[in-house]
């Protein structure tokens, strides 16, 4: 067998159908970032297997240009590969000088890309047909699907292996779960309460790594999974997958960015279009229809009230929160809108909110609401706070924010509010500079825990 025909079997079988088309180097963000080193190491093994150097000296000796490329490849593989190396490889393998023969490396590389690519040929664009197919799946089948989805997303460190049809199915599953659950979910401790994430997927993974991936820990998220960050799809999909797999241990509330007239302006719509453009017109509305059905409030142990935004003067009892409307138009002035938009502030009474939506409320309003509802603490998100958490109204309300170094322009830490089975409250703080974790427990004299024991 000559050197020219000495090719890996997997490549040899595909030569006629795959080569000599231009080599489409992957362009997904994950491959250009975290997956770069792994991918280039695979190519390096192919180089060795295909005896690349011999080909350059023998059958492929066609000038100084190829020899220079060979040296450049060696420099790439001998060093630490980076995003620029991927760009250079893409440029090399699309070079006209390398298209005139079935070189084993190029064929094997093309086959690798073809085998690793995600096929979206099975997408059913018509919503009714999709829903009809998904409705046939059992709850057990859906949980198995969600578990596989989680493993795929985590193993690939991103969406490189996620099919569009699987995203449609996950949305369908979670919409069904949210619809069945009440507008105010009532749960017990222990639970870890997380604030805004805003598309910061690496930080979400750090939160799980520190506190335990589900189901090792129970979680309650306060909303704002998307917008302003770089990995909105990864964040919302991982959270939805955990929700589908552990519907009673992983709770998700709706934030003001889970609203179509907000997330169409602040990044989520653009990301869906840029990364799933062919199916954007179907996928983006599906996301928002599902978000419309998310619960708005949670009550932990009957004593800790949680929501994304804050309070409303329309709240007269816990039954008002149990009966919140879903879906609703968030542009309206209503109780549901206040739950997602209102803010605590150093004001007296209920005043107009500078955001242009909902209201602000003062310390007295917080204390009176706690007495009215017979609760000990209000936990909410919605605002960046420097230390990741910040108390208000004599520790009757706390703001929790879980996106450190927010938008890469703030120096804030992130925090998680930990509630024990006995409703004792403590906080884990993730520092942005080195992702150090500190645990702050409320002291016996001035703690939330002491308030809850009254």
UniProtKB/Swiss-Prot annotation:
Q: Which GO terms describe its biological process?
A: defense response to Gram-negative bacterium
Provide the active-site residues from the annotation.
Answer: 257 (proton donor)
Q: Which transformation does this protein catalyse, written as a reaction?
A: O-phospho-L-seryl-[protein] + H2O = L-seryl-[protein] + phosphate; O-phospho-L-threonyl-[protein] + H2O = L-threonyl-[protein] + phosphate
EC assignment: the record states: 3.1.3.16
Query: Do you know which PROSITE patterns this protein is assigned to?
Result: SER_THR_PHOSPHATASE
Family indicated by similarity: Belongs to the PPP phosphatase family. PP-1 subfamily.
The name on file for this protein is: Serine/threonine-protein phosphatase C23G10.1
């Amino acid at each position: 067998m000559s050197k020219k025909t000495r090719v890996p079997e997997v490549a040899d079988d595909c030569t006629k159908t795959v080569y000599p088309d231009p080599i489409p180097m992957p362009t997904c963000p994950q491959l250009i970032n975290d997956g770069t080193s792994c991918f280039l190491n695979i190519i390096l093994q192919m180089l060795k297997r295909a005896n690349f150097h011999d080909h350059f000296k023998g059958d492929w000796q066609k000038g100084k240009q190829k020899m220079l490329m060979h040296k450049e490849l060696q420099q790439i593989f001998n060093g630490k590969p980076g995003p620029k190396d991927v760009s250079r490889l893409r440029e090399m393998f699309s070079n006209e000088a390398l298209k005139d023969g079935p070189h084993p490396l190029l064929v094997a590389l093309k086959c690798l890309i073809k085998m690793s690519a995600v096929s979206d040929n099975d997408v059913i664009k018509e919503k009714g047909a999709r829903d009809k197919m998904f409705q046939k799946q059992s709850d057990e089948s859906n949980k198995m699907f969600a578990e596989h989805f989680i493993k795929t997303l985590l193993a690939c460190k991103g969406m490189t292996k996620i099919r569009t049809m699987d995203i449609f199915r996950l949305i369908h599953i979670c919409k069904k779960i949210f619809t069945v659950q009440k507008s105010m979910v009532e749960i017990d401790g222990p639970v870890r309460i997380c604030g805004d994430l805003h598309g910061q997927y690496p930080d979400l993974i750090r939160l799980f790594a520190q506190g335990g991936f589900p189901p090792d820990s129970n979680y309650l998220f306060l909303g704002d999974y998307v917008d302003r960050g770089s990995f909105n799809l990864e964040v919302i999909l991982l959270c939805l997958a955990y929700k589908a797999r552990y519907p009673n241990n992983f709770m998700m509330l709706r934030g003001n960015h889970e609203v179509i007239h907000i997330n169409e302006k602040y990044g989520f719509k653009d990301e869906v279009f840029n990364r799933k453009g062919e199916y954007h017109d179907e996928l983006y509305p599906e996301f928002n229809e599902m978000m419309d059905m998310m619960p708005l409030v949670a009550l932990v142990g009957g004593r800790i009230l949680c929501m994304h935004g804050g309070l409303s003067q329309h709240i007269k009892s816990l039954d008002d929160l149990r009966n919140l409307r879903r879906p609703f138009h968030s542009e309206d002035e209503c109780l549901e809108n206040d739950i997602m938009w209102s803010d605590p502030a150093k004001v007296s009474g209920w005043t107009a909110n500078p955001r242009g939506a909902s209201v602000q409320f003062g310390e007295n309003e917080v204390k009176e609401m706690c007495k009215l509802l017979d609760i000990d603490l209000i936990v909410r998100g919605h605002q960046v706070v420097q230390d990741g958490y910040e108390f208000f109204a004599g520790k009757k309300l706390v703001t929790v924010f879980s996106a450190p170094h927010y938008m890469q322009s703030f120096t804030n830490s992130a925090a998680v509010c930990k509630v024990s089975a006995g409703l004792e409250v403590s906080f884990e703080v993730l520092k942005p500079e080195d992702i150090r974790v500190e645990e702050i427990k409320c002291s016996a004299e001035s703690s939330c825990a002491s308030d809850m024991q009254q």
